[in-house]
From Swiss-Prot:
This is DNA-directed RNA polymerase subunit beta. InterPro entries: DNA-dir_RNA_pol_bsu_external_1, DNA-dir_RNA_pol_su2, DNA-dir_RNAP_su2_dom, DNA-dir_RNAP_su2_hyb_sf, RNA_pol_bsu_bac, RNA_pol_bsu_CS, RNA_pol_bsu_protrusion, RNA_pol_Rpb2_2. One of its GO terms (biological process) is DNA-templated transcription. Pfam families: RNA_pol_Rpb2_1 (PF04563), RNA_pol_Rpb2_2 (PF04561), RNA_pol_Rpb2_3 (PF04565), RNA_pol_Rpb2_45 (PF10385), RNA_pol_Rpb2_6 (PF00562), RNA_pol_Rpb2_7 (PF04560). It comes from Listeria welshimeri serovar 6b (strain ATCC 35897 / DSM 20650 / CCUG 15529 / CIP 8149 / NCTC 11857 / SLCC 5334 / V8). Belongs to the RNA polymerase beta chain family. SUPFAM superfamilies: beta and beta-prime subunits of DNA dependent RNA-polymerase (SSF64484). It catalyses: RNA(n) + a ribonucleoside 5'-triphosphate = RNA(n+1) + diphosphate.
Amino acid sequence: MSGHSGHDVKYGRHRTRRSFARISEVLELPNLIEIQTASYQWFLDEGLREMFRDISPIEDFAGNLSLEFIDYDLGEPKYSVEESKNRDANYAAPLRVKLRLINKETGEVKDQEVFMGDFPLMTEMGTFIINGAERVIVSQLVRSPGVYFNGKLDKNGKKGFGSTVIPNRGAWLEYETDAKDVVHVRIDRTRKLPVTVLLRALGFGSDQEIIDLIGDNDYLRNTLEKDNTDNAEKALLEIYERLRPGEPPTVDNARSLLVSRFFDPKRYDLASVGRYKINKKLHLKNRLFNQTLAETLVDPETGEIIASKGDILDRRNLDQIIPNLENGVGFRTLRPTDGVMEDSVLVQSIKIYAPNDEEKEINIIGNAYIEENVKHITPSDIISSISYFFNLLHGVGDTDDIDHLGNRRLRSVGELLQNQFRIGLSRMERVVRERMSIQDMTTITPQQLINIRPVVASIKEFFGSSQLSQFMDQTNPLGELTHKRRLSALGPGGLTRERAGYEVRDVHYSHYGRMCPIETPEGPNIGLINSLSSFAKVNKFGFIETPYRRVDPETNRVTDKIDYLTADEEDNYVVAQANSKLDEQGTFTEEEVMARFRSENLAVEKERIDYMDVSPKQVVSVATACIPFLENDDSNRALMGANMQRQAVPLMHPEAPFVGTGMEHVSAKDSGAAVTAKHDGIVEHVEAREIWVRRVSLVDGKEVTGGIDKYTLRKFVRSNQGTCYNQRPNVAEGDRVVKGEILGNGPSMDSGELALGRNVLVAFMTWDGYNYEDAIIMSERLVKDDVYTSIHIEEFESEARDTKLGPEEMTRDIPNVGEDALRDLDERGIIRVGAEVKDNDLLVGKVTPKGVTELTAEERLLHAIFGEKAREVRDTSLRVPHGGGGIVLDVKIFTREAGDELPPGVNQLVRVYIVQKRKIHEGDKMAGRHGNKGVISRILPEEDMPFMPDGTPVDIMLNPLGVPSRMNIGQVLELHLGMAARALGIHVATPVFDGANEEDVWSTVEEAGMARDAKTVLYDGRSGEAFDNRISVGVMYMIKLAHMVDDKLHARSTGPYSLVTQQPLGGKAQFGGQRFGEMEVWALEAYGAAYTLQEILTIKSDDVVGRVKTYEAIVKGESVPEPGVPESFKVLIKELQSLGMDVKMLSADEEEIEMRDMDDDDFTNQNDAFNIVQPENAAAEKTE
């Protein structure tokens, strides 16, 4: 195998990698943000129309007026995407709806087009722009509507069952057994009733009718005994009393209540998915499987016998009678009397012998194939679900696993928007009805009826404050892509963190190929937030499907026909793994093949295989698929690796990894961070900000040139996370490009591939203990050569408002500020672009009028003579906060006069962008792709770093002890392969679960002329002596993470204090102090450091008088005074007194001290000495 393992694969225009993949890719990866774009497109095409259809027509209470929705269209957006961002606006288009108002008395018809608010549009990248910020709507995983059965044990260990019919919206119906074998029903979470009461209410009034319907059995007899009603009317009254306790029940009220609760499409909605699930569950086909018939089945039309009494219905027999089942075998038309529904009920019922009692006949009742468009529940559904429940008690039927992905579905953007829009429309409907009855019928127009406020408000609320509408994670392109593919079980109608148990969070076998088992956050959300697997798609019902290659049942060959299966469908098939060996014709070469069936992994004869995986990476998500040698890492560490890649800061000079997985190109292309070609063509002109492409198309075999596409590149824009979003051209003039090709690299990209970090020379060795506990030692070369330098852009804004005392003003003329501080401000008081600023420098000069104080006699005299009072203003300028210094990149000014839309009361708004270039630094966090993270503890001069025999110093030293216990061996393989790749001048691709194996790595190492063990002798840079043992040195891909020490460093001498306790606030954001907590106090007590302790608890914290005096003493150079009484002690006393306790303070001589005596008289002007937080900022108080 020496030398030539692997083959070359091209990724985009500029990169070729040697790939070690053995399995050929049958299927291209789908477009990775399709889950967002396709769902929104559905909403625009179908979802909106469905909504208007549901609500139309709106009729008034008398039925004279009727308002219909005929059509709608979306206009052109007011601003482009870029403009919306700059102006803090929404990227939205006006929604216009065509309405028709019909006056039924006069037959008059009025048509009118009505504006219904601006509707947010999705950008091509799958994001929304709301108030100028990019947001993502995360898809939600919820329980699918349908009917579920589950087994449960009561406290005596007796097995019982429970069942629930869950609608999309409407009342729940729950069945359960109790200890006495009585079957109960609960309607909409009320008290339970015997289930026979519900059957009687449906019109099966007598005991005999119920027994004929369900079939005679002990459970039913027990339930009938418990049931104290004996006809339909009594049953209706009984149900009414449960649902509306305290109201006088009448039969008519009860009837209409039940009808509106369950059979009214406006109040009860299963959605198409619920109808599909219910029909599937209650269908006789699945319920008769492997059962023994207790009656002979006869075709109702021809009279021929289809199956005889005593036949066992195995898969073959069942498949034969399915067409007959669908044509009406066993159909019974029931005619209920006095019940809720007047119409007859059609059910399908077949008798079989109970599996747990051969003598006993039981009825299996199905709902007789209700049409897909019936969105509410029907009496036959209720009867069939009750029948299923009784069948379960006799061992027929299956219970459902709620965590199975066949029972959980996705609500993507389109559906979430539709639900929100529906809320708005139904609120509007109420208003329309009221207006219809109030206004004059002759002159009324649709425009006067419609109030669009509720609709606009509900959409705004959804995008602005829903839990699923999130500020996009834009740290780097991978973070962006993952955020759009995220699946959350939280949010409205979903789970809550506290309630979610272990089962919901756990990995389930049905996740295979649908949800990534690895990528999920660590912490309270683990398992509740997941990521879509790389090949997964979402079907029209919202179930996740994964692709498989079909195996031809005749020839047993694997074909290239791809089927997308939901978790439910997959349960019926045996699926072989992607790495099963095939010959050229696609036949399995081995007799026994490793395969999956439901939750089992089995070795199966090759004839039993139905499907085969398309690719080894179909199990994992995009971020996980970017980890090379994933198969050699422990899953916990892989999880950290996948999550940390999303936190990589875009570097100034990014570099694609030597050891990649081949996913780098696809993920960069689909993330939306790159500039991609919209059409084929030839590049005519390239500059930093623009690329022009002349379109070229083939017409009748001839090339025809068309118009020019101009692509604008974004330069040095601030991303949502404050990293620098910068695009660079990736093509040259004269290049031919094809549609979808990358024209410009975005942030963290190199030659059209994702490039989150840099390839650096790493040695696994300790060095004077500086890499204890995962710390990292780094060479100064990485600082000097800007290897890990990143650019950060921060935004600060200042607004001039109207106040009660007059307008604020932006000006250069600021009280008590020297000319030196104003040197970089222009005549308007705004900083110039390019100025270098440090902490506390002025950015925008602004003054606010002060309250007018009582004038003294002298001032009044002066005022009388000169008529001019000294201008009373205070300085409220915008200054650079701590740690925010840098260079002013850009200044944006918005004013009312220039026609910019500003919030009410704001006259002028100034935004200042400050850019920082951050070199790597001690205390910064770095990581590899295998969950191997650490903090830089020391940056050594190049000459002190250990060097290789050829004199090359290493770049980074990692602790070898970080590897064995964490079991992420992938990093060691990456190290050796990376070294070989660098020596050979190649890039390699080692896809997950199908990458380079050990032999490949060693043969590449040998090809590169490295030592057999891939280790090196290293020499100490300080003494020049060789280290005792050979050391693993190689090239590893290391990334710098967003947790940088500059953002965390914080110090305070004096600052804001909390209003009530007078203690310093906490946290960097509030410029707070460090909490000296209970345990720290114990430490000082243990040392007997009484004075230090007293000082910390009083003058450094909340002894208001003492801290001012101490400050004064320090300034004047005097000795520090005695500490006084802490403010929190006074608060404690007041709290005790407010509880009605008489608390007195006594001095040493047991004399009472008044609270007032504790304050010093000469202490008056404390508010000027210290900035005490006033109540409006009291929100900043963080209670520990």
